[in-house]
Amino acid sequence: MRGYHGDRGSHPRPARFADQQHMDVGPAARAPYLLGSREAFSTEPRFCAPRAGLGHISPEGPLSLSEGPSVGPEGGPAGAGVGGGSSTFPRMYPGQGPFDTCEDCVGHPQGKGAPRLPPTLLDQFEKQLPVQQDGFHTLPYQRGPAGAGPGPAPGTGTAPEPRSESPSRIRHLVHSVQKLFAKSHSLEAPGKRDYNGPKAEGRGGSGGDSYPGPGSGGPHTSHHHHHHHHHHHHQSRHGKRSKSKDRKGDGRHQAKSTGWWSSDDNLDSDSGFLAGGRPPGEPGGPFCLEGPDGSYRDLSFKGRSGGSEGRCLACTGMSMSLDGQSVKRSAWHTMMVSQGRDGYPGAGPGKGLLGPETKAKARTYHYLQVPQDDWGGYPTGGKDGEIPCRRMRSGSYIKAMGDEESGDSDGSPKTSPKAVARRFTTRRSSSVDQARINCCVPPRIHPRSSIPGYSRSLTTGQLSDELNQQLEAVCGSVFGELESQAVDALDLPGCFRMRSHSYLRAIQAGCSQDDDCLPLLATPAAVSGRPGSSFNFRKAPPPIPPGSQAPPRISITAQSSTDSAHESFTAAEGPARRCSSADGLDGPAMGARTLELAPVPPRASPKPPTLIIKTIPGREELRSLARQRKWRPSIGVQVETISDSDTENRSRREFHSIGVQVEEDKRRARFKRSNSVTAGVQADLELEGLAGLATVATEDKALQFGRSFQRHASEPQPGPRAPTYSVFRTVHTQGQWAYREGYPLPYEPPATDGSPGPAPAPTPGPGAGRRDSWIERGSRSLPDSGRASPCPRDGEWFIKMLRAEVEKLEHWCQQMEREAEDYELPEEILEKIRSAVGSTQLLLSQKVQQFFRLCQQSMDPTAFPVPTFQDLAGFWDLLQLSIEDVTLKFLELQQLKANSWKLLEPKEEKKVPPPIPKKPLRGRGVPVKERSLDSVDRQRQEARKRLLAAKRAASFRHSSATESADSIEIYIPEAQTRL
C-alpha cells in the first residue's frame, strides 16, 4: 500500500511488538495471508508449510492453526506467519494462532529476525506435503523469483526476504478474495478504481519485489515505514499503487492499524485488505495480503459460525471502519473477483449461476477492499451473521445484472437445478441472456491469454486491460490451479465453476465430491491444472461427471432480430435435454421450437454448432455473427436444418441447427399456402446440365412444372449431398423444403422412365435401369415422412400413377412409330407423328423424370430435402397438363389412323372458314343445307375451341404461376435478408 506512516490512525508498531499485539487478540486473530507471486504457476498444487515445525502436518487434517503462536523464525507466531495449515480459509479451525502482522509474515530483510528456512528446503517440503492435507484443494501458488529466493527486492534496497510467500499470505489472499466475493455485487462505475485500478502495475505484489509504481514514490525511502521490514514489505506493496502517487507524501498513507490502508479515498475504513495485484506478466514477489493488526483483525476475520449459508465466510466479520469512516463505494464498487457465490458456504448447487455480467465485470477487479456503504451499517464488532451472502443480490449487483429476476434467482442461496433450468428457459432475452453470452460462453471460448484460471476476466469492452491484469494477478494466483482443475474435471461447457458455491465448499469443507457440490475436484489427478488454462471452445457439449447436479449450459446466444442462430448446449445430457437457448429467442414460437428439439437424444458424435463463436467480446459481434448466420438462409435452405417431415431421423444428426432461420416462420406460412394444389410456382424444366439455368424461368409451358417449387437463385449449398454445379440446383419448395433437382441422376435429355415396353431409341438404358431399381426399391419402401398426408397419395402412389402414364405414352409413341414405318404416310402426318412422339419423349425425359425423382426423394429416408406429398400432388397436377397436351396430339393421330391416314380434318378445316364469311352473303333460300353442313363442322370447331380454351387457361395458369414464381423469387430473398 502507499505510505504507511505512523499517523495513519494507529501508531506504527514494530514487528517485534506484533506478536504481543496479536497475542492480545487471542484466537480470533488470524495470520495474514501472503500470496506468492503469480510467476510460473505450477500446475501441481503447492501446499505451504509452516515455517516452524515442518513436520507438523497431520495427514488428515489441515495443519492446525491452533498450534499456538509458536514463534517463527521472524519472531512472529509460526502458525500465523506460515499459515499453520494449507487451509485456505481464515477461521476454519477454532484454535488458530493469533495474527502476526503482515510485516512478520512478509520476508524481512536479511539479518532482521531469525533467519528463515532456506527456500529450497521449504520448496522440497512443500512438494512432499500430502496433496490435500485438510481436505481442501489448497490453492497452489508458485513463488515468484523474488519471493522464492534471496536477492534484493527490485524496489527495495533492503535485503531480499528469503520467502515472501508464506501460507499465511496465501490464506490472507484467499480471505481477501472471499471478502471480495462477499462484495462482488458492488459494481458501480469503475471510475474511482485508481488506487487499485489500471495503474496497479506499479504495485509490487509482495514484499519480495516492490516495483516502485508511478505513484509509489519509488522505494520505501519516500514512505517512512515503521520498520525497515515493515517498510520494505509495504513499500513493495504500495510500490505498485501507481495511482497513489498524489497521496505519496501526505499523512493519508499512515495505516490505521499498522498501515493497513494507505489509500485515503476508499481505504479510510479497515473494511478490507488490499490484495496488491501485479500484472500477470511481471515476475515478482508474492502478494502480501496483510491482515489488520490486533483488534482490527478480530473484527475483520470472523470464524464461520454454524455454516449459515447467508454469511460470507470471508467478509462476515469484516471489521467495519473503526474510525467510522466508510470506504467510498464508488471507488471500490467493482473490486471483486466475482467469485462471490463461492464465498458462501451454504450456497446451493444452482448458486454458481450468477449474473454473467456480474461475473464479467467482477473478474476484472481484484481489489479486495469492500465498499463501506453496504457494510457500514453493521457494528464494528462484526456479528457473525452480519453480511449475508444474499447481499450479492442487492443493489448494484442486480444493476450489473440488469435483471432483478435473474439477480434474485441466481443469488438465492440454494437454487435447485430444476429451478435454475426453469429460470434459464423462461427468462426472456434480457440482459441476463446477453450476460450469459458474455459470461457463460467465454470461459470455454476465450483463449485465456495464458493466464491461469480466472486471470482473464471477460472483458465486455468497458473494463480496462490493467484491471484485467490485476484480476489475473490476484485471481489467477488464487483460482488458477483450482479452476483449471475444476473446469477440466467437469469439462464444463460454459459456467465458471469457480463461481459456484462448490468451489468454496470444496476449499472450505474439503468436500471434493460433496452431495451439494459438483465433483469439482473429482478428477484432479487427470486434470493437471494448466498454468495458462485456456478453455478451448470444445465444439460438442462435453460430458459431465455423473454427480453434477446443476449442469451449466453454454448458450451461445447470438441475439438478433430473428435469433434462430441461437445455439445452445445443455452440458449434462440428462433425461430431458434442456435447451436454455429459448430465452434469447424473440418470440415464444421460436423458443418453443428450440425447446421442442431439446429432448432429442444426443448424437453419438455431436455436430459442432453451426455458430462457432471463437471469441465473444461483446454483444455487437454476436449480432454481427447472427446477421452473418441470418444471411445464409436468405440464399437458400440452410442445409443443417431439421426437417419437420423427418424430425425423427434428422434431429439426431442436426440437433444444433434449428432450421432455416427466417424461413422457419415463412415455411409454415408457405406450407399453408401450398395446400392449394395448383398454386404452383415455376421451376424450369430445361436441361439442367448448366448451373446457370437454375435461376432461369423459361416461358415454355411444356418446360414448366411444379405447383410449389419456388426457385431462389441459390447456388447449391454444401450439404449431405455435395452437389455438383453441373447437375444440381436447389429448388425451394413453397410447401416446406428446398430439394435438389438432379437428385441422384444427371439430367439425361431423352431419358424415359423404365417401362416394360420397348423404349424409344433416345432413351438411355442405364438411366432407365437406375430408375427402375429406384421404383422397385421405392415401391417396397414405405414413405419415411413424419408429415401426415391428407390423402393416401404418397410417393409410392404417385410412382404407380406415373408408371401407368409413362407406359401409356410410350405405348402410343411406339404405335405411332410403327405406323410411320409400316405405311407410306404423307409428310404432314409424319410431321404430326414426329411432333407427338417428340413431345412425349421430351415430357418423359424431363418432367416425368423430374417428378419421378421427387417421388424417389419423398420415399428415400436419406434424401435431405424431402418433398411433401402436397408438393408431389401439385407437381402431378401440372404434369397432367403436359400429358394432356401430348394426349391430344396422339388422339389426333388416332383419328387420322381411323381415317386411313387421310388428312380429312385438314380439308374440312379448309372448308370451315368459308362458311363464316358466307353467312351474311348467302341468300335466305340456301341456309338450311349449309346449316346442316355447318352444324357438324361447327360442333367440331366448338369442341376444338373449348379444348383450346381449356389448354389456354391451363397454360395461362401455368404462366401466371411462373410469373408469380419469378416475383417471389425476387422478393422472398429480400424479405429474408431484411428479417
Curated annotation (Swiss-Prot):
Residues 221-246 have a biased composition (Basic residues). InterPro entries: SAPAP. Residues 540-549 have a biased composition (Pro residues). Coiled coil: none annotated. The keyword Cell membrane applies. GO terms for cellular component: cholinergic synapse; glutamatergic synapse; neuromuscular junction; plasma membrane; postsynaptic density; postsynaptic specialization. Residues 1-10, 190-202, 769-779, 927-940 have a biased composition (Basic and acidic residues). GO terms for molecular function: amyloid-beta binding; molecular adaptor activity. Residues 1-20, 52-95, 136-169, 182-291, 400-429, 537-581, 741-790, 908-940 are annotated as: Disordered. GO terms for biological process: modification of postsynaptic structure; modulation of chemical synaptic transmission; signaling. The modification Phosphoserine is found at residues 58, 406, 409, 412, 416, 643, 645, 932, 935, 967. Keywords: Cell membrane, Membrane, Phosphoprotein, Synapse. Belongs to the SAPAP family. PANTHER family: DISKS LARGE-ASSOCIATED PROTEIN 3 (PTHR12353:SF4), DISKS LARGE-ASSOCIATED PROTEIN DAP SAP90/PSD-95-ASSOCIATED PROTEIN (PTHR12353). This is Disks large-associated protein 3. It comes from Homo sapiens (Human).
